[in-house]
């Protein structure tokens, strides 16, 4: 086992604090509308330019192992906030640095670290209660756009685009962000249920120009197994022909004689039909077929459920206003499923999302949820160069996460005002134990850190801004760093999601509390290089 290097108390905290400061100072320059960019070297290709706090934090690795431990713990703050709220990573880092700094001073002055941590926790709980009380629900699409704009560093076009996408696909809908090949940033919205399986034969095409099969007011047969022959299906096929409506068959596969018969019928004009493979694999395929059955108001034909193909009637088939199938995708628009059934299924999938521990499963469940509940929107980010596209994509993703968080827990005044106003709630707290009270006071001071940093990044003295805001009685009065003006933050549209502010403070105080209570640090001792070998002796050349 390699030898270890151990540092204690003051020495350990000093090294750790140095690491915290290096990482936090690199991250905090990005805070606010006038935050600066950070350029990150890449081992290949052009460097990356970003204003995303967590991206900067993830790139920092320090040479000194003890300093690096401090930096990595603050990096964890940014990562955790990003995972939970998707934004607010820089605010969380600034708060963590402020709490650790003040905490380290208090410990150096001889206070009990455990009591300090208790005080920090009491104060944070009071702030969170205050934020929850102040949060107001997002009422309109324009408020969604404002949240997006603030998170995208004042880019109103991005805010507007996210609001448009959310309006179309609903709050449960899936919005993905991709890179665009052109200069423009655009939104592409898919209404209805879309899955990545196309027609099994090009002979099913009805629109030769677009190479798509478009079937209006269609019946949908959902079959769990492969279809090799159509003998068992004849009764239901005849009933569909008599109704004069088209039929879409979705099964594990349609092959051989079955596919040939369907193609011949389609070409002769006897039956408007198209066949598609079922989406997904294994258990997921079955679940997606059940989703389709609920969405279209039909039944999944499965022998497990005791339904045989020969017993299928037209009533068991699903219905949809329109089905569009191209070479690679199928879209079902306006399925005839009953709303209560769809809502029950959505509730079931939400419960599964909460229970699952696998990120992959969660992602797939969220996709299913979106397809059932709303739709899918894709924001394609464009730009003149690859570097610009990547930087813009970071901002779009931040803005998207912030708007989702706002819809969940409501909004509070932005620009660090919500935390600053929470000082009143913390100021009321008193504790007989002086060290616990000192912990409460640490949070009281740290609540000013984000607004000070936003002001300083805009070239304005932070303490003057804090003083001026606290003098004003209005709860929503704050500093608009973009225009260097004092305004009503909510009226001006400078708002933050309550969830982002709450998560940033919780994560920052959690890690900062651990750093403050650290008394020893253990790292691998640096290896001493072995002395170089003796050079070979001079020979007796030739003898």
From Swiss-Prot:
Gene Ontology terms, MF aspect: ATP binding; ATP-dependent protein folding chaperone; isomerase activity; unfolded protein binding
Catalytic activity annotation: ATP + H2O + a folded polypeptide = ADP + phosphate + an unfolded polypeptide
Main location: cytoplasm
GO annotations of cellular component type: GroEL-GroES complex
UniProt KW keywords: ATP-binding, Chaperone, Cytoplasm, Isomerase, Nucleotide-binding
InterPro entries: Chaperonin_Cpn60_CS, Cpn60/GroEL, Cpn60/GroEL/TCP-1, GroEL-like_apical_dom_sf, GROEL-like_equatorial_sf, TCP-1-like_intermed_sf
SUPFAM superfamilies: GroEL apical domain-like, GroEL equatorial domain-like, GroEL-intermediate domain like
Main enzyme class: isomerase
Location of the protein in the cell: Cytoplasm
HAMAP family, alphabetized: CH60 (MF_00600)
Subunit structure: Forms a cylinder of 14 subunits composed of two heptameric rings stacked back-to-back. Interacts with the co-chaperonin GroES.
Function: Together with its co-chaperonin GroES, plays an essential role in assisting protein folding. The GroEL-GroES system forms a nano-cage that allows encapsulation of the non-native substrate proteins and provides a physical environment optimized to promote and accelerate protein folding.
Family classification: Belongs to the chaperonin (HSP60) family.
Protein name per Swiss-Prot or TrEMBL: Chaperonin GroEL 7
């Amino acid at each position: 086992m390699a030898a270890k290097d151990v540092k204690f108390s003051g020495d350990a905290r000093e090294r750790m604090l140095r690491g915290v400061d290096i990482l936090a100072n690199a991250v905090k320059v990005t805070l606010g509308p006038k935050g600066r960019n950070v350029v990150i070297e890449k081992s290949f290709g052009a460097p990356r330019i970003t204003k995303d706090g967590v991206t900067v934090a993830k790139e920092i690795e320090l040479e000194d192992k003890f300093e690096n431990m401090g930096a990595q713990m603050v990096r964890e703050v940014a990562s955790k906030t990003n995972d939970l709220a998707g934004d607010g990573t820089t605010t969380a880092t600034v708060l963590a640095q402020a709490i650790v700094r003040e905490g380290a001073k208090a410990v150096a002055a001889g206070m009990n670290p455990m009591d300090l941590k208790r005080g920090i926790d009491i104060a944070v709980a009071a702030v969170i209660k205050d934020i929850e009380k102040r949060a107001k629900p997002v009422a309109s699409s324009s408020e969604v756009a404002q949240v997006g704009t603030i998170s995208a560093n004042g880019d109103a076009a991005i805010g507007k685009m996210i609001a448009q996408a959310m309006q179309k696909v609903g709050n449960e809908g899936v919005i993905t962000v991709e890179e665009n090949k052109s200069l423009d940033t655009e939104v592409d919205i898919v209404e209805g249920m879309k899955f990545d399986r196309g027609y099994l034969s090009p002979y099913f095409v009805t629109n030769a120009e677009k190479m798509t099969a478009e079937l209006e007011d269609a019946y949908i047969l959902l079959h769990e197994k492969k279809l090799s022959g159509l003998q068992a299906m004849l009764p239901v096929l005849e009933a569909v022909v008599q109704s004069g409506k088209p039929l879409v068959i979705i099964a594990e596969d349609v092959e051989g004689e079955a596919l040939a018969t369907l193609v011949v019928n389609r070409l002769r004009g006897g039956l408007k039909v198209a066949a598609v493979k079922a989406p997904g694999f294994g258990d997921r395929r079955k679940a997606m077929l059940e989703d389709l059955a609920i969405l279209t108001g039909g039944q999944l034909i499965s022998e497990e459920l005791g339904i045989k193909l020969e017993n299928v009637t037209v009533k068991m088939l699903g219905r949809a206003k329109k089905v569009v199938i191209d070479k690679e995708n199928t879209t079902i628009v306006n399925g005839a499923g009953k709303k209560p059934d769809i809502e029950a299924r959505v509730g079931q999938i939400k419960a599964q999302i909460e229970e699952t521990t696998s990120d992959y499963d969660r992602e797939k469940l969220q996709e299913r949820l979106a397809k059932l509940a709303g739709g899918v929107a894709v924001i394609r980010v464009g730009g003149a160069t690859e570097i610009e596209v990547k930087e813009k994509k970071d901002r779009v993703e931040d803005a998207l996460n912030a708007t989702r968080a706002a819809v969940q827990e409501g909004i509070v005044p932005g620009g660090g005002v919500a935390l600053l106003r929470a000082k009143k709630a913390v100021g009321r707290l008193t504790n007989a134990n002086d060290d616990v009270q000192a912990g409460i006071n640490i949070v009281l001071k740290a609540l000013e850190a984000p607004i000070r940093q936003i002001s300083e990044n805009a070239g304005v003295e932070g303490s003057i801004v804090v003083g001026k805001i606290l003098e004003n009685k209005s709860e929503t009065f704050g500093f608009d760093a973009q225009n260097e003006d004092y305004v009503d933050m909510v009226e001006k549209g400078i708002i933050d999601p309550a969830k982002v502010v709450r998560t940033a403070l919780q994560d920052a105080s959690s890690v900062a509390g651990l750093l403050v209570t650290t008394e020893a640090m253990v790292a691998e001792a640096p290896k001493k290089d072995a002395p170089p070998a003796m050079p070979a002796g001079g020979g007796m050349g030739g003898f």
